C-alpha cells in the first residue's frame, strides 16, 4: 500500500479516511466555517496539503449531497491536483458558487477525491472518416 505524505493545515477537520470503509473515495472537509450569499463564490479551504506519488493525480468532486445540503456548485466541475502541487502551503481548495444563501461549518464533508494514475501517452492519427456509423450527435443518446 503506497504511503502519501500529508500535512494538515487545520485542527478543525477530521483526519482523512476512506468513506465508511466501503468506497475507494475519500471525504474532504471544510477547514473553516464559511457563509456565502446567493451569487457569491469562493475558494473553500480543505485544510490539507499532500505529496502525491510521481505519475499520479487526485480527482476532486463534490459529494452527491453537497448541492442539496448547501446549494453550492463546484465551479470548475472537477478539480485535478497533480503531483507538482506538493508544497508545504499548497492547500487543496474547492472553488464553489452559491446558488442560495448558505453556511458551511468547519469539518462539514463537502467533497471527495480519489488518486488515479496519469493517462498513458497517446498519439493522435488524423483521418477523414472514422469508419463507424454516426449515432445522432452529442446529447442524442437515449432519445426516442
Predicted regions and their residues:
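DUTPase catalytic domain/fold
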Residues: 1-144
Amino acid at each position: 500500500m503506497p504511503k502519501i505524505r500529508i500535512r494538515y493545515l487545520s485542527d478543525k477537520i477530521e483526519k482523512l479516511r476512506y468513506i465508511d470503509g466501503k468506497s475507494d473515495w475519500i471525504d474532504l472537509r471544510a477547514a473553516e466555517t464559511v457563509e456565502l450569499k446567493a451569487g457569491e463564490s469562493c475558494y473553500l479551504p480543505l485544510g490539507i496539503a499532500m505529496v502525491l506519488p510521481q505519475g499520479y493525480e487526485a480527482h476532486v468532486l463534490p459529494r452527491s449531497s453537497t448541492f442539496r445540503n448547501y446549494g453550492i456548485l463546484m465551479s470548475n466541475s472537477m478539480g485535478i491536483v497533480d503531483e507538482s502541487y506538493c508544497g508545504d502551503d499548497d492547500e487543496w481548495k474547492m472553488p464553489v458558487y452559491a446558488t442560495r444563501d448558505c453556511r458551511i461549518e468547519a469539518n462539514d464533508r463537502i467533497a471527495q477525491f480519489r488518486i488515479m494514475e496519469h493517462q498513458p501517452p497517446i498519439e493522435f492519427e488524423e483521418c477523414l472518416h472514422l469508419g463507424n456509423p454516426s449515432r445522432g450527435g452529442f446529447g442524442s443518446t437515449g432519445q426516442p
